[in-house]
Curated annotation (Swiss-Prot):
Originating organism: Danio rerio
Gene Ontology CC annotation, any one: extracellular space
Top-level taxonomic group: Eukaryota
PROSITE patterns the record matches: PANCREATIC_HORMONE_1, PANCREATIC_HORMONE_2
GO biological process: feeding behavior; negative regulation of adenylate cyclase-activating adrenergic receptor signaling pathway; neuropeptide signaling pathway; positive regulation of circadian sleep/wake cycle, sleep; positive regulation of feeding behavior
InterPro entries noted in UniProt: Pancreatic_hormone-like (IPR001955), Pancreatic_hormone-like_CS (IPR020392)
Signal peptide: 1-28
Similarity annotation: Belongs to the NPY family.
Protein name (database record): Pro-neuropeptide Y
Localization per Swiss-Prot or TrEMBL: Secreted
Function according to Swiss-Prot or TrEMBL: NPY is implicated in the control of feeding and in secretion of gonadotrophin-release hormone.
Sites bearing Tyrosine amide, chain numbering: Y64
Length: 96
């Protein structure tokens, strides 16, 4: 097989895998509700605003629990706050 053809096939495979990975990332994100328009009935607007409020709460909620990535895990281990060594606060340094 031609070396140039191998290079193009490898680039095509990498691009395909990149699109697959990006597709899986976007599937996990909630979709914004559709706006019914300005002349929609009050019931439709109430449903839309309720769905919009729910959407905003989903994308801005605090995430608690074991959702740490490897980077935050390493930084927590190196400079993290523990019971024996509490993290210093900026305000404590200005207590003069």
């Amino acid at each position: 097989m031609n070396p140039n053809m191998k290079m193009w096939m490898s680039w095509a495979a990498c691009a395909f895998l990149l699109f697959v990975c990006l597709g899986t990332l976007t599937e996990g994100y909630p979709t914004k509700p559709d706006n019914p328009g300005e002349d929609a009935p009050a019931e439709e607007l109430a449903k839309y605003y309720s769905a919009l409020r729910h959407y905003i709460n989903l994308i801005t909620r605090q995430r608690y629990g074991k959702r740490s990535s490897a980077d935050t895990l390493i930084s927590d281990l190196l400079i993290g706050e523990t019971e024996s060594r509490p993290q210093t606060r900026y305000e404590d340094h200005l207590a003069w």
